[in-house]
Amino acid sequence: MLPSCYANGSMLPDNEELVNSMLANPDYLRTQVSPNPLAPSAVGGAGMEGLMCGSFSPAFYYQGIDSFLALHNNIWGLPISFLHNSHRPEKPPFSYIALIAMAISSAPNQRLTLSGIYKFIMDKFPYYRENKQGWQNSIRHNLSLNDCFVKIPRDKNTIEDNDSAGKGSYWMLDSSASDMFEQGNYRRRRTRRQRHCGHPNRYERESGKDSNDGNSSAAEIRSPSEPLSDFDIFCNERPNYSDRITDLHRQYLSVSLGFNSLFNNEARGLRPLPEIRECPDDVDASSSSSKAMQSSMELHEELHSPSAFTPPLNRRETSSSGAPVLAEAFNGIKDVVDAPGSSPVASSNRSKTTLFTIDNIIGKP
């Protein structure tokens, strides 16, 4: 059976009033705590009546928690976030691209190293002074993946202001992306643009020499007396990746054109067949059929010869001469036929005995 104090709640004061009274005077809990009534010295001569709840001090039930309750008068009404660090600065409402652009624009020479960008962000925005590894990785990714930022090689022998050592490279804003952020509003970002250098690259300059439009290409080239900026020097030394791929594709097409012409019907129709000498009147009809078979096999050997797959050095020479370069493969056959001292009959007999024809297979005389 429970003690009477648990059955009748009127004997104890209200819990809320008790907590408020203890918070108002925290020393009350320490001074009013009585010894444990359940100790042997306390219950030695007392009966069950001495163990009634009414004989305990109210502070007995709350001892040990006064230091926690004394933190705040309304601690139980505070949110859970109060237990965390509530003094961390708020995250700035700017993207990483905007932070990088702000850092580079604030530099005197409009260029900064990677460590300089880190320093600017941490000095201006205290939020980024913690968890440096996470946001610094994001800064590096945005520098390498966006065309609005240009990496400029740095001279290791020169040390500028605010630079501890000549290491790393400079980062600059692309001149073609100057209008990406409108009126200093770094929250907006336009569609990603592809960077184009102001000067023609090496491949365009070589092609411009062969073309007849020399005046137009010369107008685009800046005069030698005008100084070049770091960005222009960087573009001249390193052409765009897309331009290099385009030039490689152009070279591949020029080489593969020789292979495609072998299977073109129009080019095949223009290819002359090797000369076949007229046989004497005493040769029968079977020899004429063997000659036709011989010419077809020679054409097959022409298409499958290694020289047929050699691309022509110049297409103009091939088209102007009228005879393709593949006709050189028959020079050996023509030399045998046109050799001095050989008669037409001897050449026809040699072709009958050496060629792999249907007549030789069936053994027809």
Curated annotation (Swiss-Prot):
A Pfam family it matches: Forkhead
**Where is there biased composition of kind Basic residues?**
186-199
Q: Where found in the cell?
A: Nucleus
- Here the segments flagged for biased composition (Basic and acidic residues) are 201-212
Q: Name one GO cellular component term.
A: nucleus
DNA-binding interval(s): 90-181
List the residue ranges of the region (Disordered).
Answer: 183-224, 276-295, 305-324
Q: In which tissues is it expressed?
A: During embryogenesis, detected in several mesodermal tissues including the hindgut mesoderm, the ventral intersegmental 5 (VIS5) muscle in thoracic segments T2 and T3, muscles homologous to VIS5 in the abdominal segments, and a small subset of visceral mesoderm cells found near to where the gastric caeca form (at protein level). Expressed in embryonic posterior mesoderm.
Superkingdom to which the source organism belongs: Eukaryota
List compositional bias (Low complexity) regions by residue number. Answer: 285-295
State a single Gene Ontology molecular function.
DNA-binding transcription factor activity, RNA polymerase II-specific
| Primary location group | nucleus
The GO annotation for biological process reads:
anatomical structure morphogenesis; cell differentiation; positive regulation of gene expression; regulation of transcription by RNA polymerase II
Indicate yes or no for the key word DNA-binding.
yes
Q: What does this protein do?
A: Transcription factor. Coordinates the placement and migration of various organs during embryogenesis, including the salivary glands, hemocytes, germ cells and Malpighian tubules. Likely acts non-cell-autonomously to provide signaling cues from the mesoderm/musculature to nearby tissues. Mediates salivary gland positioning, at least in part, through activation of the secreted signal Sema2a.
Q: What is the name of the protein in this document?
A: Fork head domain-containing protein L1
Provide the gene name from the record.
Answer: FoxL1
